[in-house]
Regions:
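Short, hydrophobic secondary-structure boundary micro-motifs
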Residues: 22-23, 69-72, 123, 153-156
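C-terminal cap/loop subdomain of S1 sulfatases and analogous C-terminal strand-loop tails that border
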Residues: 2-3, 20-21, 27, 32-35, ...
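Residues at secondary-structure transition points
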Residues: 12-13, 49, 60, 155, ...
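Tryptophan-centered motif/residue detector
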Residues: 15-16, 78-80, 153
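Histidine-centered active-site microenvironments of extracellular/periplasmic hydrolases
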Residues: 1-19, 30, 170-171
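Long, internal low-complexity/basic segments
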Residues: 34, 108-110, 116, 121-171
Length: 171
């Protein structure tokens, strides 16, 4: 997978008690939201703190008017610390905050910025026309990767045939 919308924007289907059939939501969720949601649905009430990036989307499942997920991190962050041979073919990270998405390539620090509300296909790179937004998102992304000691890209590392300790050189 990669952090382009075609790699991360996929349908999610869930069923269960008190969840009405046929509801739809445009609120984005990530894999990190599953544990808090399942725990919330099961009645777990202790806070996870900032050890878990995700948040519960139970209220979205129960109430179509709910539009937010309370997460420990601001925005949605994706990290691909290796060359994967898929669309982008290079190690990269991304942050989505509100309508904007920043993609940062780790081999040369190239930045791409998209307004997803107007350009879901990610064809119009706004990196040169929105420098303030670009810088703010890059700062937030870099701070997060450092905070969580995200695996750092090294030349020659791919997702195949490498021991995990070779991939895990941290920020």
């Amino acid at each position: 997978w990669d952090a382009m919308e075609g790699g991360i924007r996929v349908p999610f289907v869930i069923a269960g008690p008190k969840i009405k059939a046929g509801i739809e939501s445009k609120v984005p969720i990530t894999f990190s939201d599953l544990l808090p949601t399942i725990a919330d649905l099961a009645g777990y009430t202790k806070p996870f703190g900032d050890e878990i990036d995700g948040g519960s989307f139970k209220e979205i499942l129960y109430n179509r008017s709910s539009r937010t997920i309370n997460r420990a991190t601001e925005g949605l962050i994706f990290h691909v610390p290796y060359a994967n041979g898929i669309a982008l073919k290079r190690a990269h990270s991304a942050i989505i905050l509100d309508d904007f998405k920043l993609i940062k390539f780790h081999d040369n620090n190239q930045l791409m910025l998209f307004n997803l509300s107007k350009d879901l296909e990610e064809k119009n790179n706004l990196a040169f026309t929105h420098p303030d937004k670009l810088n703010a998102l890059e700062k937030g992304l870099d701070a997060y990767l450092t905070k969580v000691k995200a695996p750092k890209w090294e030349p020659g590392i791919t997702w195949k045939n490498k021991p995990i300790e070779k991939i895990n050189s941290f920020h």
